[in-house]
A protein has these predicted regions:
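Conserved glycine-rich Rossmann-like NAD(P)H-binding loop of the short-chain dehydrogenase/reductase
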Residues: 25-40
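A short, exposed helix-loop element centered on a Lys and neighboring polar residues
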Residues: 119-120
Length: 144
């Protein structure tokens, strides 16, 4: 039986690299993007060329309803997940006293609330199976 990993923000960058590596290790991949489904589909194509199953899901991880819908779809398509890689994130390059309120809210929504939303949904499934792995990726920019 194959194992499945959901990698948020996996249409490009570090998330895509993680998704490709997990595919090389034998995982089927749920590719998540916030907006660019075309780019996510390119990641899916690369993963399937490695012989693994992959499906793209467009969902804003900061929106709990979109996250719940994504997890329901993943359950239908893959039968659940074994690994969650919380990678989706944004960086608004500004110092503490210069950051705009909108940028701060966007960063908190995606970088914290989004991770929590996905981890909570994954945990509900993983607890039932009594197994699972959650990996949270951050960066040096998380330091104010």
């Amino acid at each position: 039986m194959s194992k499945t990993a959901l990698v948020t923000g996996s249409s490009r960058g570090i998330g895509k690299a993680c998704a490709l590596k997990l595919a090389e290790l034998g995982y089927d991949i749920a590719v998540n993007c916030n907006s660019n489904l075309e780019m996510a589909q390119k990641a899916v194509d690369e993963i399937t060329s490695l012989g693994r199953k992959a499906v793209a899901y467009k969902a804003n991880t900061a929106d709990i309803d979109e996250v719940k819908d994504m997890f329901r779809s993943i359950q239908q398509d893959f039968g659940g997940i074994d690994v969650l890689v919380n990678n989706a994130g944004v960086v608004d390059d500004a110092y503490l006293l210069m950051i705009k309120d909108e940028s701060l809210e966007r960063s908190l929504d995606i970088n914290i609330k989004g991770y929590f939303n996905c981890a909570r949904q994954a945990s509900l499934k993983m607890l039932r199976k009594k197994s699972g792995i959650i990996i949270n990726i951050s960066s040096v920019r998380s330091v104010l």
